[in-house]
């Protein structure tokens, strides 16, 4: 998961850090910003924590989870003022990653990297909620394939050079992280 090439290894580490520090904002904001996503997510959490609960108990627990989590979106910097920026950042990232992943199975080539795992963890969860699931499944087949591939990642080739990654990965890095 650690490329030998120092530049590509740095990019992997940069993507890992980005996934932990910014992409979690996408997931958390989107999960708790809209009723449809709140209900779906809270329902999954309730079902996972109480698999033997009755329908009535699950409804009650779902609402408890929902109320608790919606009130926490501010912890990741999500509020009415920042919501448009968080969502615009996510939508641009999804488009950029779709383009980048059209020609390779993983972010840095033929095998998963440290960066894949971090970013995937957030985007997998973005995909499990109805609003963004509909977007990804309708318009982003390469990104969807990567999300699903990362459930059981395997080596399919080597890491690519920075020169081969740069045309489609640098725009993502520039827009999301900076120059």
Segments from the language model and where they lie:
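GST-like domain detector, emphasizing the conserved glutathione-binding G-site
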Residues: 1-57, 107, 127, 179
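A non-catalytic, amphipathic alpha-helix used as a structural packing/dimerization or gating element
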Residues: 7, 11-15, 85-92, 96, ...
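Intrinsically disordered or highly flexible coil/loop and linker segments, enriched in small
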Residues: 25-28, 103-107, 132, 156-160
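Divalent-metal (Mg2+/Mn2+/Ca2+)-assisted nucleotide/phosphate chemistry catalytic cores
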Residues: 33-87
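Short N-terminal edge-element motif at the start of the domain
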Residues: 73-107
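Active-site/pore-lining binding-face segments in mid-to-C-terminal subdomains
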Residues: 120-179
